[in-house]
Amino acid sequence: MDLLAPLSAVVLTYREVSAEALGKVGQEMKRCIERRARAFPMYVLHTCSRVEAYLYGAPPEEVQEVAEAYRRYVDSVRVITGAEAARHLFRVAAGLDSILIGETDVLGQVEEAFDRQVRAGYTRGLLKTVVERAVRVGKRVRTETAISRGPRGLGSLSIIYVSRLLDLRQAKAAVLGAGAVGSGLAMELASRGVGKLYILNRTFEKAREVAAKTGGEARPLTREEVERCLRECDVVFSSVHSMEYVIDRVPEGASVKIVVDLGVPQTVAPGLPVKVVRIEDLRQVAEQYNAERAAEVAKAEAIVEEELAALPRLLARRYVEETVAALLETAMTAAEEEGARAGCDAAALAAKTTVKRVLLPLVEKMKKMAEDGQMEEAVRLANVLTQAVGRKT
């Protein structure tokens, strides 16, 4: 039984379309996961350079419907299935599919999306295991190779870009957003000795937390405070998730000279009377560092393949564990019902004891089989036992 076969991914990246188009698709996928994830597990990764929807156990027609939702905005959509879908997610988490090879920001974004969607109940079951393993791959790659040495991500590249246009040590800077990208921006600006730093976030406590680490000043992310920063600062970096423009005008007499848009989707309106730096402007800077990191790519790819080879065994073990938990729950409920019918607590206790005595050795045997690589046999036995007690897997 191939437990990777039910995995599908619908993928769109910066290579195929503009950041503006990615933003529109990202909005559609937010609505899509809210509608569909109750029926089957889903995981959506939306960053400034990609929108990817992962589904587990969805019928082919459902996967195609998700792909069609992408095609309302763009034609260049890829559908990947099985082990290839897992490999793609592992490479994304490792930074191997990024504008800047080995960037660390994307790993934080993978984790943020995962945590949020697990809490919402969207990412669960074996899909949860796949994404957890992708995070592990990303951490291993950055620990065991030098692929992330230097700029950490698009935020770092944007700071390098801006530093060629003005002296950051004499500048006032604001960072809108305190997530993975925003907090990274703030930390790097502080390390470069920026003249004055402001951190704005919708959750003010998060802004205060980042400000405390960077010596910056926390402000709430409101329209009034954004305009205040535009009036006071030389450069403003936007890294927020927003379905509307966060910056759509520049106040008269504002000090701002440069606005950097790393938002998801684009959060800075076109046509502003200042220099706006967008992701497309950072590709040339990225190419320089990608050449330096090329020697580490093979090492990172080897880690991806090693973890991918181990994934089927891990999924089999998790599948057995989940099936066994459901099996025991069903059996214990049946024992309680029998005891209740007998009208005797002692009878219920005896029934539960019998269930444990009969099933636990089989449970341990199935787990051991999965751990020893007898994956198909373990899964088959789990299914047989589950069907025997009347629960379909």
Curated annotation (Swiss-Prot):
EC number of the protein: 1.2.1.70
Family annotation (InterPro entries): 4pyrrol_synth_GluRdtase (IPR000343), 4pyrrol_synth_GluRdtase_N (IPR015895), GluRdtase_CS (IPR018214), GluRdtase_dimer_dom_sf (IPR036453), GluRdtase_N_sf (IPR036343), NAD(P)-bd_dom_sf (IPR036291), Shikm_DH/Glu-tRNA_Rdtase (IPR006151)
What pathway is it annotated to?
Porphyrin-containing compound metabolism; protoporphyrin-IX biosynthesis; 5-aminolevulinate from L-glutamyl-tRNA(Glu): step 1/2
Q: Where does NADP(+) bind?
A: 177-182
The Gene Ontology terms for molecular function here are: glutamyl-tRNA reductase activity; NADP binding
Lineage top rank: taxon: Archaea
Q: Which SUPFAM superfamilies match?
A: Glutamyl tRNA-reductase catalytic, N-terminal domain (SSF69742), Glutamyl tRNA-reductase dimerization domain (SSF69075), NAD(P)-binding Rossmann-fold domains (SSF51735)
Q: Which reaction does it catalyse?
A: (S)-4-amino-5-oxopentanoate + tRNA(Glu) + NADP(+) = L-glutamyl-tRNA(Glu) + NADPH + H(+)
Residues in the active site? 48
Pfam families, per this entry?
Answer: GlutR_N (PF05201), Shikimate_DH (PF01488)
- Residue numbers binding substrate: 47-50, 98, 103-105, 109
* Biological process annotations from GO: protoporphyrinogen IX biosynthetic process from glutamate
Please provide the record's keywords in A-Z order. Answer: NADP, Oxidoreductase, Porphyrin biosynthesis
Indicate the annotated site residue(s) for Important for activity. 88
Subunit comment for this entry? Homodimer.
Q: What else is known?
A: During catalysis, the active site Cys acts as a nucleophile attacking the alpha-carbonyl group of tRNA-bound glutamate with the formation of a thioester intermediate between enzyme and glutamate, and the concomitant release of tRNA(Glu). The thioester intermediate is finally reduced by direct hydride transfer from NADPH, to form the product GSA.
What does this gene product do?
Catalyzes the NADPH-dependent reduction of glutamyl-tRNA(Glu) to glutamate 1-semialdehyde (GSA).
Family from the record? Belongs to the glutamyl-tRNA reductase family.
Query: Domain description from the entry?
Result: Possesses an unusual extended V-shaped dimeric structure with each monomer consisting of three distinct domains arranged along a curved 'spinal' alpha-helix. The N-terminal catalytic domain specifically recognizes the glutamate moiety of the substrate. The second domain is the NADPH-binding domain, and the third C-terminal domain is responsible for dimerization.
HAMAP family named among the record's database cross-references: Glu_tRNA_reductase
The identity of this protein, by name, is Glutamyl-tRNA reductase
Query: From which organism does this entry originate?
Result: Pyrobaculum neutrophilum (strain DSM 2338 / JCM 9278 / NBRC 100436 / V24Sta)
